[in-house]
């Protein structure tokens, strides 16, 4: 099963995340199938590859709760249902 989840990177206490499509049995920081965005919780900065995310969601990828809330803020699910 493919999941959309966060991949941690950055320095200690200055963490950032990449939103990735990855096999659900892979490690948190394992090799992703595709990088789909960026999220920095310190500045609340978010950059998303919306066409790539919509494609993965239509293929059946399941977002984690955190990624789901990020995508809802960006109103990505409206584009999936359209």
Curated annotation (Swiss-Prot):
Coiled coil: none
Keyword entries, A-Z: Ribonucleoprotein, Ribosomal protein
GO biological process, one term: translation
Highest taxon of source: Bacteria
Cellular component, GO annotation: cytoplasm; small ribosomal subunit
Pfam families xrefs: Ribosomal_S16
Molecular function GO terms recorded: structural constituent of ribosome
Family label: Belongs to the bacterial ribosomal protein bS16 family.
PANTHER family xrefs: 30S RIBOSOMAL PROTEIN S16, SMALL RIBOSOMAL SUBUNIT PROTEIN BS16M
Record protein name field: Small ribosomal subunit protein bS16
Phylogenetic placement of the source organism: Bacteria, Bacillati, Cyanobacteriota, Cyanophyceae, Oscillatoriophycideae
Gene for this chain: rpsP
């Amino acid at each position: 099963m493919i999941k959309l989840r966060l991949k941690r990177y950055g320095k200690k206490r200055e963490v950032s995340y990449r939103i990735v499509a990855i096999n659900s049995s892979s490690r948190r920081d394992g090799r992703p199938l595709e990088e789909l965005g960026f999220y920095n919780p310190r500045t609340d900065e978010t950059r998303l590859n919306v066409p790539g995310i919509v494609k993965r969601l239509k293929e059946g990828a399941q977002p984690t709760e955190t990624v789901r809330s990020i995508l809802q803020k960006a109103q990505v699910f409206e584009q999936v249902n359209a």
